[in-house]
Amino acid sequence: MPLPRLLSTALLCLAATLAHGADLQPLKVANQKSTIKALLQVSGELEHVPYTIDFSEFPAAAPLGEALNAGAVDVGALGDAPYVFALGAGAPLKVVSITHMNGRYTTALLVPQDSPIQQVGDLKGKRIVTTKGSIGHLLVIKALHEAGLKTSDVTFAFLLPSESRVVLENGSVDAWSTWDPYTTVATASGQERVLVSGATLLTNHLYLAATSQAIADKRVQLQDFVARVDRAWQWANGHPREYAAAMAKVTGLPLEIQLAAAQNTHMERVPIDAQVIKGLQQTADLYRSEGILTKPVDVSHGFDPSFNASTPLAASAQ
């Protein structure tokens, strides 16, 4: 093809790309304590985005799931355990991306350093604090079952992480089930120790879940957003200090705590496949058997594998 014609074709393609980007609707992203926004900012993935991203802040996964259910946001990140609750509430959601969190204390059941509790079996008759419907809640259930105990053998107190450590340290409860960076904060202080880690008991998956309406109306934006988040996590794996500094600013936690958490955690995207769906179904069935869910939940409708091959729009627009 002659050079003038080649340049003309390239300019037409670029114009079409820019025009398409101008027509794209804003993507409404649920942001849990600024974590996704901070990740995308520090990794450079909020640059050259051919559509607007509107972030909304939520203090925890439960209200984030409620916002998704209500259609107030298009997409948000939450753990597999709270996602089951969202599906159980009838939320028209689908997982569009899954990131595996491989870390030393990504989730853990903690007890005071001087506690006489040495194994999970010692928790019988004790009080455990966690956040209801959280990954910490799921860890307690699985740990108790593995030790031959029932959830009725303990007493639960359901609080947010910011309140949970206070009641553990003042002796109101005997154990706390939580996740990073709270696990790192607690163990670094020397006041708490890990009774059991969720590394072998849980999948430790982080879901990006989108509403069915957003998938229908904003698929192009969602595919691009999924790819950006994936690239951002890959960047964070290789730049733990920079990532930790960004997270310290938004969480208010000391830099050394965030750095320890970042250095001990590796994020890796995994495909949406039959094995993942089976694992979540087992979690849903466990919640049903515990009476936490009032009716059976078929989780197979809550995934969209077509997003497995998502690539960023910016790669072609730049």
Q: Language-model segments: what does each one mean?
A:
Residues 22-150, 156-158, 174-177, 193, ...:
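Short, glycine-/small- and polar/acidic-enriched structural segments
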Residues 81, 156-157, 162-249:
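Pocket-lining segment of extracytoplasmic ligand-binding domains
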Residues 217-294:
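Secondary-structure end/capping motifs
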Residues 42-43, 67, 71, 75, ...:
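Structured segments of extracytoplasmic/periplasmic soluble domains
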Residues 12-21:
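Hydrophobic h-region of N-terminal signal peptides that target proteins for export
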Residues 1-8:
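Bacterial N-terminal signal peptides that target proteins for export
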Residues 288-318:
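Conserved C-terminal helix/tail region of periplasmic/extracytoplasmic solute-binding proteins
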Residues 37, 65, 69, 80-83, ...:
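Extracytoplasmic/secreted envelope proteins and their assembly/folding machinery
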